[in-house]
Structure formats: structure tokens, C-alpha cells
């Protein structure tokens, strides 16, 4: 079930040491992935903004994507983007990058903010990404939702406030 939520607009992700393996360098940032069997975190660091704390190099965290394994797909638990980097559509780019580079299937989070619904709406507009929905996690009823003004619109069933699950895979 995907429900609508509201979050505060200001986010400061701060400085931290780079964690995980470097999986790519895009848009002037380093993208690192830390993965276990059931969880994965993807961090985006600004290469140009850093400071030294106790003789260790700490870079500014630009974006964070937290994923957990559920029903054969990677469930989006949390995506955050630092307020200083607003307007660059980093979350959209990060979703596409993760889908293409890691070759995984993403499953929409069970609670989505306005920004989260917008990200999935823009993913559906991309020709290199296939977005589909199931009436339930184990359902055989599959729908290919259309893009709406700000959120996806299902053809066969309501995507929000029901038990529907939304997925994205690189085409």
C-alpha cells in the first residue's frame, strides 16, 4: 500500500566519511554503495566540498537512498536530498543511475511524500525505465500506469491508498 505523507522541506545531510564501494562518478559527484544481503544504501558525495575532522577527510553528503530487499525487489525506504542541492533533480537521476548501473528492480516506498510521487511520475516518462504496478504484492493483475500531473494514475486500479505496489526496472 502506498500512502501519502508530508515531510519538512529543509534537510541538511552534513559531512561524513565516504562509506561503501565507489559505483560511479556522475554530475560532479561520487556515488558510493554499501550493500548487504537484505539492505543497501547509496550515498552521493560532493567531491569539491570537504573538511578534515580528526585527520580524516569528510565530504558533504548530497543525497542518500536507503533500500531494503522485499518480495524480490529493492524497496525504497528513504530518499533524502540536501536542501543546498535542490532543483538539480538529483533524486530522479539517482534512481535512473541505480536502475541502470546495478540492474535491480525498485519498489516504491509504502509512504510517499509529494516529492516521492513526483519522482515516480517522472520515472514513468523516461523511455529507458519501465514502471508497472501490481494490485497487491503477490497479485497477478499488472497495470502500466500513466503519468499524471504530479503523480501516477492507474488504468485498472487506484495506486494510492490501496494495497497496490509500484515497481521500476531499466528497460
Language-model features, listed with the residues they occupy:
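Non-catalytic substrate-recognition and accessory regions of acyl/acetyltransferase enzymes
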Residues: 1-86, 93-171
Amino acid at each position: 500500500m502506498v500512502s501519502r505523507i508530508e515531510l519538512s522541506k529543509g534537510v541538511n545531510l552534513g559531512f561524513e566519511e565516504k562509506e561503501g564501494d565507489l559505483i560511479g562518478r556522475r554530475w560532479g559527484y561520487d556515488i558510493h554503495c554499501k550493500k548487504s544481503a537484505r539492505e543497501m544504501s547509496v550515498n552521493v558525495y560532493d567531491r569539491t566540498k570537504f573538511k578534515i575532522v580528526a585527520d580524516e577527510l569528510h565530504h558533504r553528503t548530497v543525497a542518500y537512498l536507503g533500500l531494503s530487499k522485499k518480495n524480490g525487489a529493492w524497496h525504497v525506504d528513504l530518499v533524502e536530498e540536501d536542501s543546498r542541492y535542490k532543483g538539480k533533480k538529483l533524486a530522479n537521476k539517482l534512481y535512473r543511475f541505480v536502475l541502470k548501473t546495478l540492474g535491480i528492480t525498485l519498489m516504491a516506498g509504502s509512504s510517499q511524500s509529494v516529492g516521492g510521487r513526483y519522482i515516480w511520475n517522472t520515472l514513468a516518462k523516461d523511455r529507458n525505465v519501465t514502471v508497472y504496478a501490481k494490485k497487491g504484492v503477490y497479485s497477478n493483475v499488472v497495470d502500466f500506469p500513466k503519468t499524471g500531473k504530479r503523480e501516477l494514475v492507474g488504468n485498472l486500479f487506484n495506486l494510492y491508498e490501496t494495497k497496490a505496489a509500484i515497481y521500476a526496472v531499466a528497460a
